[in-house]
């Protein structure tokens, strides 16, 4: 499948004008083109950079990969330790019991004993939704939290023992497990997701719903063991009325009932569908032939599903919340939305990355010939869509900026001038409820501002998809390089002297796609946060707090570029910038540190490798003059490694900056 020559065909030339380059890659190591310098790498820091770059780069046939794959129980063990620690700290160092008595108080963690006759020293505000989750589970005491923490440690120990057994003792079982990915996928669907959903539905019906009904009615909660029978549940429902869960006061929500129904139906679909239905590999030729033979393709599909589910949950966390008291805890709503949007974005990009690796290493181009022959049409249409959306979506803002500069507000796109309401705006209602001093918001009234920024969402998302789809479809071959099998997933930029291989590897497409994913998710969470907190402010400014009579800051000022810069970024950052010396100081310090990490990334992204190599050579010259010669010669990072370091700092710094900015603002204004 691999040729020792690349035929580079000019698209507008005849066959006699074909240019052939004889390029010998026989010395290149499989998995990375950095193997060309393998001889010198052992005496230079290049070996260190390669160690980082190749840490997860192993093929299906290696024994190491079988060990790692068999040790997946160790990963589950780490998750159990995390869960155990969460419940342990909730039992000993949180105000969960106080929050149960009065959910209007702020959930906090790490409450320590008095020091030098002082009160609790700035407990950490919990915005992860754990308190709401525990109440939805039916946990009403710290004893139950301690039991769960102990169970988590026991489960983690069992997982670690099972992982050790799979890695070192049961080699035959490991071999069978790793060579039958299709059966493993069925095991995941039936055993983990199917039976897990069924067990969770049973817990919601027998424990969570009765406990929440009793709490809402002010009745003492019995032992959970007494609620396991259907008779006990029926008695509670008959005596206390099931309508207690249908109230919309922000405390106990009917969606908890729908969650039980949803998980029961999902369990049936997964268990039956994975064995007999369309989810089984027996009735799915694509799964059995292609996806089932490649770990990377299986992982890519799973990342797609998980990432999509995370994004959907982010939308549901505010539009249709399941957990009790969530709607009146505004910092938690914001945190859940932002967190799951980021997770979904990273998972979806990771799906394209692993699909590209699988296409390069584990499949033949003929397997995807139907798709690959249409890739130019696919990319051509995507390019047209991106260009159309970009010009028209930004054109709306350019028009408004121009009209505002000319002093013609009546000619701007706005609710008060040229209205551009979404087609289905009437279907999305806004429900406001005042619960004590807190205000709960369910749903959002759509306006011209939403119409404009939603088209920006469409543009950024389609651009991200264009980059990632191009990287996937051209991962194995392209017009420039007709077979990338030995070049693999990532290879260096060789410049125009080698035909111009800059930015054509699948890794480079993932690199660029992550930046656009960052842009896409940033605009989404900016839109959500600004509209959410400005709606809260306008509700409080209204008479009685029951009907929103004032237009929000988002509706009035997000229709032009200056509004985003002035009203959202500059004005909204006042709390985090002025937080020093206040209980919000941690957010201010995080804001500063994250800005530094983000700025550090630019040093790697804006400079070339030659600059750093020449700087290193100058430092080495000085060392030689002083007869202090390092045994291992320093080498600059490769282009790919430098981009990876820059990308990592860019994403982490940007996310930390946004997170601290959001939380400081929402805690100070609506917390």
Curated annotation (Swiss-Prot):
Cofactor note (record): P700 is a chlorophyll a/chlorophyll a' dimer, A0 is one or more chlorophyll a, A1 is one or both phylloquinones and FX is a shared 4Fe-4S iron-sulfur center.
Disulfide bond positions: none
Enzyme Commission number(s): 1.97.1.12
Residues annotated as transmembrane: 68-91, 145-168, 185-209, 259-277, 295-318, 334-360, 377-399, 451-469, 509-530, 584-606, 644-664
BP GO annotations: photosynthesis
Principal EC category: oxidoreductase
Keyword NADP (UniProt): no
Keyword Thylakoid appears in the UniProt entry: yes
Reaction equation(s) it catalyzes: reduced [plastocyanin] + hnu + oxidized [2Fe-2S]-[ferredoxin] = oxidized [plastocyanin] + reduced [2Fe-2S]-[ferredoxin]
Main location (coarse class): plastid
Positions of [4Fe-4S] cluster binding: 493, 502
GO molecular function annotation: 4 iron, 4 sulfur cluster binding; chlorophyll binding; metal ion binding; oxidoreductase activity
Superkingdom assignment: Eukaryota
Record key words, sorted: 4Fe-4S, Chlorophyll, Chloroplast, Chromophore, Electron transport, Iron, Iron-sulfur, Magnesium, Membrane, Metal-binding, Oxidoreductase, Photosynthesis, Photosystem I, Plastid, Thylakoid, Transmembrane, Transmembrane helix, Transport
Subcellular location: Plastid, Chloroplast thylakoid membrane
Gene3D superfamilies the record matches: Photosystem I PsaA/PsaB
Residue positions binding chlorophyll a': 595
Protein family according to the UniProt entry: Belongs to the PsaA/PsaB family.
Reported function: PsaA and PsaB bind P700, the primary electron donor of photosystem I (PSI), as well as the electron acceptors A0, A1 and FX. PSI is a plastocyanin/cytochrome c6-ferredoxin oxidoreductase, converting photonic excitation into a charge separation, which transfers an electron from the donor P700 chlorophyll pair to the spectroscopically characterized acceptors A0, A1, FX, FA and FB in turn. Oxidized P700 is reduced on the lumenal side of the thylakoid membrane by plastocyanin or cytochrome c6.
Listed name of the protein: Photosystem I P700 chlorophyll a apoprotein A1
């Amino acid at each position: 499948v691999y040729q020792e020559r690349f035929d580079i065909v000019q698209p507008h030339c005849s066959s006699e004008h074909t240019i052939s380059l004889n390029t010998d890659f026989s010395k290149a190591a499989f998995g990375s083109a950095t193997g060309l310098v393998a001889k010198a790498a052992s005496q230079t820091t290049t070996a260190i950079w390669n160690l980082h770059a190749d840490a997860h780069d192993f093929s299906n046939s290696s024994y190491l990969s079988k060990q790692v794959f068999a040790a997946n129980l160790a990963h589950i063990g780490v998750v159990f330790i995390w869960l155990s620690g969460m419940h342990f700290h909730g039992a000993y160092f949180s105000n969960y019991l106080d929050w149960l008595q009065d959910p209007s108080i702020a959930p906090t963690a790490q409450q320590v004993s008095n020091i030098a006759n002082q009160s609790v020293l700035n407990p950490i505000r919990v915005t992860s939704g754990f308190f709401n989750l525990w109440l939805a589970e039916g946990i009403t005491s710290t004893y139950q939290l301690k039991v769960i923490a102990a169970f988590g440690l026991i489960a983690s120990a069992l997982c670690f023992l099972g992982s050790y057994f799979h890695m070192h003792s049961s080699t035959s079982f490991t071999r069978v497990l790793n060579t039958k990915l299709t059966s493993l996928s069925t095991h995941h669907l039936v055993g983990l997701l199917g039976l897990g959903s069924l067990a969770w539905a049973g817990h919601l019906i027998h424990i969570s719903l009765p406990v929440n009904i009793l709490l809402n009615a002010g009745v003492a909660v019995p032992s959970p063991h007494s609620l396991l029978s259907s008779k006990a549940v029926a008695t509670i429902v008959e005596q206390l009325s099931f309508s207690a869960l249908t109230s919309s006061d922000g405390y106990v929500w009917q969606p908890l009932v729908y969650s039980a129904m949803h998980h029961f139906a999902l369990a049936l679909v997964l268990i039956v569908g994975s064995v007999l239905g369309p989810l089984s590999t027996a009735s799915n030729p694509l799964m059995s032939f292609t996806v089932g033979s490649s770990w990377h393709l299986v992982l890519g599909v799973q990342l797609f599903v998980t990432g999509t589910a995370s994004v959907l949950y982010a939308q549901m966390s505010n539009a249709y919340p399941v957990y009790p008291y969530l709607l009146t805890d505004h910092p938690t709503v914001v945190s859940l939305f932002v967190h799951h949007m980021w997770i979904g974005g990273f998972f979806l990009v990771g799906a394209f990355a692993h699909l590209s690796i699988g296409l390069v290493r584990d499949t033949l181009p003929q397997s995807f010939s139907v798709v690959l022959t249409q890739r130019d049409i696919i990319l051509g249409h995507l390019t047209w869509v991106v260009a159309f959306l970009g010009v028209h979506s930004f054109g709306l803002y350019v028009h408004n900026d121009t009209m505002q500069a000319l002093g013609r507000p009546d000619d701007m796109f706005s609710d008060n001038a040229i209205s551009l309401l979404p087609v289905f705006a009437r279907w999305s209602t806004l429900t406001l409820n005042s619960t004590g001093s807190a205000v709960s918001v369910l749903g959002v009234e759509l306006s011209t501002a939403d119409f404009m920024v939603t088209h920006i969402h469409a543009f950024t998302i389609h651009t991200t998809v264009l980059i990632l789809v191009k990287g996937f479809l051209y991962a194995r071959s392209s017009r420039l390089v007709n077979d990338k099998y030995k070049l693999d997933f990532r290879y260096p930029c060789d410049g125009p002297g080698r035909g111009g291989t800059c930015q054509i590897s699948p890794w480079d497409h993932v690199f660029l796609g992550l930046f656009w994913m960052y842009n896409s998710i940033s605009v989404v969470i900016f839109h959500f946060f600004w509209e959410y907190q400005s709606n809260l402010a306008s509700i409080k400014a209204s008479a009685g707090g029951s009907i929103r009579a004032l237009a929000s800051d988002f509706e009035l000022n997000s229709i032009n570029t200056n509004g985003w810069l002035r009203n959202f970024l500059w004005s909204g950052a006042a709390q985090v910038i002025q937080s020093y010396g206040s209980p919000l100081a941690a957010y201010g310090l995080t804001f500063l540190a994250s800005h530094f990490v983000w700025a550090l990334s630019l040093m790697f992204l804006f400079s070339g490798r030659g600059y750093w190599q020449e700087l290193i050579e100058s430092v080495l010259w000085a060392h030689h003059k002083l007869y202090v010669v390092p045994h291992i010669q320093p080498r600059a990072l490769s282009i790919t490694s430098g981009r990876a370091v820059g990308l990592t700092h860019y994403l982490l710094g940007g996310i930390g900056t946004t997170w601290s900015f959001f939380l400081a603002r929402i805690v100070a204004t609506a917390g």
